[in-house]
Amino acid sequence: AASDVYKRQVFEDVYSIIADRKIHPKEGSYTNYLFDKGIDKILKKVGEEATEIVIAAKNPEPEEIIYEISDFLYHAMVLMVEKGVTWEDVTQELAQR
């Protein structure tokens, strides 16, 4: 359905904004803060967010899981941009599985 395509486009749109922030830094941007701090900070945040998903999954409210997965995906996209990995790379890998 058209709405499904739009929903998937959100991933590309957020990724594009993150990639643009790397090329055109914006003062006060959390994304730029992560890029400025470097790979260790980015990896730390990815790990923290993954752990928060696990903790949220133990609770009965799905909203908490949704929130934490969204945080994780954002930080994973920062990592993807930092390492030059695209959604095309990821979707091709998933399609092969």
Go through each PLM region and give its residues.
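A charge-rich, low-complexity, intrinsically flexible signal that marks solvent-exposed coils, linkers
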Residues: 17-20, 25, 34, 74
